[in-house]
Every structure is written in structure tokens, then in C-alpha cells.
Amino acid sequence: MVLRNPDKKGIASALDERSGEIFRRIVESYLESGEPLGSRNLSRLLPISLSPASVRNVMSDLEDLGLIYSPHVSAGRLPTQTGLRFFVDAFMQVGNLSPEERASIERQVGPGNRDHSVENLLTEASQMLSGMSRGAGLVITTKSDPVLKHVEFIRLAPTKALAVLVGEHDQVENRIIELPAGITSAQLTEAANFVNAHLAGQTIPELRTQLEKVKETVRGELDALSQDLVERGLAIWSGSEGDGQPARLIVRGRANLLEGLEGTEDIERLRMLFDDLEKKDSLIEILNLAESGPGVRIFIGSENKLFSLSGSSLIVAPYRDSDDRIVGAVGVIGPTRLNYSRIVPMVDYTAQLMSRMSR
């Protein structure tokens, strides 16, 4: 498991044991309650005897370093985004999942789930991460290359037909193609039978590599009109775009992000976040973030442009297929005061299970 570790040596060298302890307490209090922590309450939490005045002096130094700030006059202190990043990199202890938590995840997205359909696993993973993290669970899956099981040509008009492609897992894709003039229903059936006999069990990319070879076979076995139909169908299928790009985003637990929002401005920022998530470019961006390093990645607030307006954090990890290709990502989106140390192992273990189930 690898976390993002920017160079914070300058900040680290400026903190002694006492200031580090005070900083850690401020951040942990924020992650737990979301409220500023004042010097008087903080002095009571410290394992060493320190007056509120001495605590305030240390707080002032931490403010100068850009690690904490005061939301308003005479308030306590909250961590800045820089402070949160420094805490995650320098102070956070990533916890271990309990046996009960591992078993719960396995029941929903592992071998313990009796419904192993891709759709069910993706939905269950997103729902499970949402429930355990109190954030929004997300799963991104890349567009797969379905293996062709069956093809049928259905006439829609004298010059148009619907080509129905059925994959090995019974997924269905429909394409409208232009028919050669004068082709009969019998020839439609003949063309479909040819495709099913010669191309079943192959993916579209595999079809691309042997398109010319298939055309030669067509010319040897079919009449001219049926040949024309098969070649038109092959041209449409092999010209499909977008293979390997993120095709789907599943998000569960959006309502969790509404908790603690204050005013229409916060709600509008959240709306913009979910609008952005629905855009294909955003899916590619999230997948790229997951691919940018091994293991779990943490992005806080404006560290990523996708979350700069909403002030959200993302914890994300990729999962892989049997060829070790990244085929998707799982993660949690939430406020910057997410329980990072608890969520990181959840995301990490879920990604491991998704990789096993994708092999």
C-alpha cells in the first residue's frame, strides 16, 4: 500500500515533539468532530502539562507554517489543506481491518457473494464502501471487449436492419446497418449463420486483426448480397470506438455527503461535484489518478481539479484483470475530514478482492 508523499521535510524539521503533538491533536479532533479546537480544551488533552497560553504560542507557530488556521476571531484552530496532507503523510497510522470487517467485505464483493455477475459486484462494492466509510462509495469500470456469442439481423425497413450482438454473458448491443439493395430475408439468415459459425467466441479487437481474412472466407461461401451484408456488419463492429476507456461510474451513498452541509453554497458545490462525475473526462481523470502509483492514493481538496470546488477528498485504488491490466478503480469520496486511517485499508482490501474476482 503506497500513499502520496510530497516533500514535507521543511515542515517536519520545524516541528519538535511538543508542537507535533499539538498539531496531531488538532487534526484528530477535526477529523472526529469537524469543530475547531481551542487552546484550553487542547491543554487538557495533552499528555504533558502545558498552559493554555503556551499552547497558543505553539498554535501561532503552526499557523505561520500554514498547517492550521482560525476560522474566525477568538475561535479554536482547524487544519488547512496543507496541514491535512502533512498529517496524512507524516502522522497517520493506517489501521488494520478486523476479521469481522474483512468477512463483511468478502460477503459482498468476494467469493462469499453468490451472485458473481459483474453488475452485482460493482454495485455491491460501491454500496459497501459507502456504508462502511460514511462517504460516497464509487466504482469505475473500463469498457470491456465482450466475446461474441450470437448475432442476428432483423429487418427494420427495405434498406435497414438491426444487427443484434449477444455477448458471452448475455449482454446485448444493437447496431443499425444499411442493407444491400434487394437482399432477401433468407439471405439475412444466411449471413447471420455465417457470422455465428465463423466469428463466435472472438472479441471485436480480435475481429479487427483478421478482418481481411474473414472477408476472403465470406467471398468463398456466400452469395454476393450476403457477402456485402457481412462485410458491412464487420466494418461497423470493428470500427467501434472507445474500447478500454472508462464506460461506467457507480456511486452509492450520495446522501452521506449532504450531512453537515451549511447553506446553499455548500449544496451547490456538491451538485457541481456530481455533475462533473457524470462526465466521461472525469471518469478518465479518476482512473488516471488511480493508475498514477501503486496501491491506494489519497487526494485532498484542490490537489485535484475535479474536487477543487467541492472541497472533497478522494481515496482510490485500481483493480486488475488476469493479465495485470488495470480494468477499473474503487474508492470513496467525502469531505476532507474523512477517517483516512480507517478508509484506506477498506479501499485497499476491496480493490484486492475486485482484482481476484476479475481474473
Swiss-Prot record:
InterPro entries: GAF-like_dom_sf (IPR029016), HrcA (IPR002571), HrcA_C (IPR021153), WH-like_DNA-bd_sf (IPR036388), WH_DNA-bd_sf (IPR036390), WHTH_transcript_rep_HrcA_IDD (IPR023120). The keyword Cell wall biogenesis/degradation does not apply. Keywords: Repressor, Stress response, Transcription, Transcription regulation. GO terms for biological process: negative regulation of DNA-templated transcription. It holds the Pfam family HrcA. SUPFAM superfamilies: GAF domain-like, Winged helix' DNA-binding domain. GO terms for molecular function: DNA binding. It comes from the Bacteria. Belongs to the HrcA family. Negative regulator of class I heat shock genes (grpE-dnaK-dnaJ and groELS operons). Prevents heat-shock induction of these operons. This is Heat-inducible transcription repressor HrcA. It comes from Sinorhizobium medicae (strain WSM419) (Ensifer medicae). The lineage of its organism: Bacteria, Pseudomonadati, Pseudomonadota, Alphaproteobacteria, Hyphomicrobiales.
